[in-house]
Amino acid sequence: GNMFGVKEFHKTANKAGIKPILGCEIYVAKESRFRKDKEKDKKSDHLVVLAKNETGYQNLIKLVTYGWTEGFYRKPRVDIELLREHSEGLIVSTACLAGPVPRAIMSGNNAKAEEIISTYKSIFGEDFYLEMQRHKTGDPEKDERTLKYQEEVNQEIKKLSEKFGVKYIATNDVHFVKKEDAFAHDILIA
C-alpha cells in the first residue's frame, strides 16, 4: 500500500476537529520480501496496520518504505521479519478475505490459520485483531459468493478468537468514498 494522501488527510481532519487515525493496508510476502517467485509470490496477503502513537507512525512509514524499496514485486510487500522489527506502536488486523487468516480458512487449512494467528499475536500482542466483514461488494455478480465466504470466515473467526484470546472487530472492505470512484479503483488494481 501507500500513504500518499496522509498529509492532506491529517490536515483536513484536524481542521474539522477530527482526530485522524493514520494507517495503511499493506501486503505481506508469503516468505521473504526479497523473494520474487513468479508462482509462489503471485498473491500477497493483506494486513491493516494503524499507528496508535508517534512511534507507531514512524514504524508504519518504515514498513511502507521498505515495502516499496526492498520488497516490491508486483506490489510493495513487507515480510514477517520487518513486522517483528517495526511492531512497536502499531495496531494490526487481518484485513478482508485477502488477508492471511481468511485465506487459510477459505482454503480449509485451519491449522495454517492458527499458525498465522499465533505468529501475529506473538508480534503485536493485544494490538492484534481478527476482522469480521459482512457486506455487499457493489457488484451483483460477486455479492452472493462474497457474502457466503464472509459468513464462513466469520463463523471460524469467532471460534479462533475464543481459542487464542484475540479480539475480533467488525469492518468493511472500503477503498473509495464515492460510488462513482469504483471504476477508477478497478483500473488502479487491475
PLM feature spans:
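Phosphodiester-processing cores and adjacent nucleic acid-binding clamps
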Residues: 1-190
